[in-house]
């Protein structure tokens, strides 16, 4: 379960916070008992791609926790000052060393229990030269039947890949929205 009461100390003065509903609000917030600062917590955006070369999809084997050693699509946390598309391209370059051309937003997945929103773009690889970064053990292309389904790191990756291959079989790609438990 997601811990909604994570802010223990004020980011302004360092004093202890208390959770209560501020005036003119409808949700509990962390409020500083000393300076009155109200702290808002919002979901984090995870951005990534489904990089494709012909009939193959590029996956990365994680060199970091959580889920060390398991396979994932190239993705990571969006940074301030970038768009979701820019973040997806950056993460693909950082994790796989891959150059891509985005082809449109593909999945938007709400992962409420961990306070995240995952956005994956379809992407075309510009070549097959990969240079995995420090967060990746290896980057490898897989045909659908070769995907290590039992070794995927995250449910959002599984959902995205399943929807990608289903759409590809139908000959058209749609935007998929879902809530992941």
Predicted regions and their residues:
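Nucleotide phosphate-binding site architecture
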Residues: 11, 18-19, 33, 58, ...
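Unchanged
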Residues: 78-163, 167, 172-173, 181
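Short connector loops at helix/strand junctions that flank enzyme active sites
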Residues: 27, 44-46, 52, 66-68, ...
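Conserved Nudix-box catalytic region and its N-terminal flanking loop in Nudix hydrolases
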Residues: 52-94
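Conserved hydrophobic/aromatic beta-strand scaffold that supports enzyme active sites
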Residues: 9, 29, 50, 59, ...
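Active-site donor-binding loop signature of nucleotide-sugar glycosyltransferases
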Residues: 34, 62, 75, 123, ...
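Acidic, metal-coordinating catalytic segment for phosphate/diphosphate chemistry
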Residues: 2-49
């Amino acid at each position: 379960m997601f811990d909604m009461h994570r802010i223990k100390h004020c980011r302004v003065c360092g004093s202890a916070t208390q959770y209560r509903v501020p005036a003119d609000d409808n949700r509990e917030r962390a409020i500083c008992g000393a300076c009155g600062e109200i702290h808002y917590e919002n979901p984090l955006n995870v951005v990534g791609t489904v990089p494709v070369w012909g009939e193959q999809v590029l996956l990365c084997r994680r060199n970091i926790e959580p889920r060390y050693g398991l396979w994932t699509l190239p993705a990571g946390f969006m940074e301030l000052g970038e768009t979701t598309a820019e973040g997806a391209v950056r993460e693909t370059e950082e994790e796989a060393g891959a150059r891509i051309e985005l082809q449109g937003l593909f999945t938007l997945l709400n992962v409420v229990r961990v306070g995240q929103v995952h956005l994956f773009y379809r992407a075309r690889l510009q070549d097959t030269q990969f240079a995995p970064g420090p967060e990746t053990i290896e980057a490898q292309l897989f045909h659908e039947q070769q995907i290590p389904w039992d070794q995927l790191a995250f449910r959002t990756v599984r959902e995205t890949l399943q929807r990608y291959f289903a759409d590809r079989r139908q000959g058209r790609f749609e935007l998929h929205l879902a809530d992941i438990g």
